[in-house]
């Protein structure tokens, strides 16, 4: 499968899942983006169109993260969950953004669940 086909497939899956996955202030959407070397996670309130918080491997808090990409993804998930719980958010809707639930995406989700987020 060529890179163009993979990108088009991911965009199609993303559009299909976004039709059913919505977040609000009490249960925001946990949106994940994975690049080749980094991972980004945001909590989004779709009703007001605002990003409540964002954490990534590029954040200043994560400047010294060591380990594999999966281990860093799990650390980002834990950090996001801790920030969310501090703001009173415990339930979220997980949006994998067209990526397969495998590898770094799964590691981030598991890290967030370990730290107390419910989804």
UniProtKB/Swiss-Prot annotation:
Recorded GO MF terms: 5S rRNA binding; structural constituent of ribosome
One Gene Ontology term of the biological-process aspect is: translation
Q: Which InterPro entries match?
A: Ribosomal_uL18_bac-type, Ribosomal_uL18_bac/euk
Domain of life according to the entry: Bacteria
Q: Which UniProt keywords apply?
A: Ribonucleoprotein, Ribosomal protein, RNA-binding, rRNA-binding
The record's region (Disordered) falls at 1-20
**Basic residues bias located where?**
9-19
Instruction: Give an example GO cellular component term for this record.
Output: cytosolic large ribosomal subunit
Oligomeric and partner information: Part of the 50S ribosomal subunit; part of the 5S rRNA/L5/L18/L25 subcomplex. Contacts the 5S and 23S rRNAs.
Q: What does this protein do?
A: This is one of the proteins that bind and probably mediate the attachment of the 5S RNA into the large ribosomal subunit, where it forms part of the central protuberance.
Q: Which family does it belong to?
A: Belongs to the universal ribosomal protein uL18 family.
Under what name is this protein listed?
Large ribosomal subunit protein uL18
């Amino acid at each position: 499968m060529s890179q163009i086909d993979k990108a088009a497939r991911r965009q199609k899956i993303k559009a299909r899942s976004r039709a059913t996955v919505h977040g609000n202030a009490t249960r925001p959407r946990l949106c994940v983006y994975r690049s080749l070397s980094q991972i980004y996670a945001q909590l989004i309130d779709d009703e007001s169109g605002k990003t409540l918080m964002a954490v990534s491997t590029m954040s200043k808090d994560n400047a010294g993260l060591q380990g594999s990409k999966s281990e860093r993804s799990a650390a980002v998930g834990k950090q996001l969950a801790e920030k969310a719980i501090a703001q009173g958010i415990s339930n979220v809707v997980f949006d994998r953004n067209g990526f397969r639930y495998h590898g770094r995406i799964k590691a981030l989700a598991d890290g967030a669940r370990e730290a107390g987020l419910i989804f």
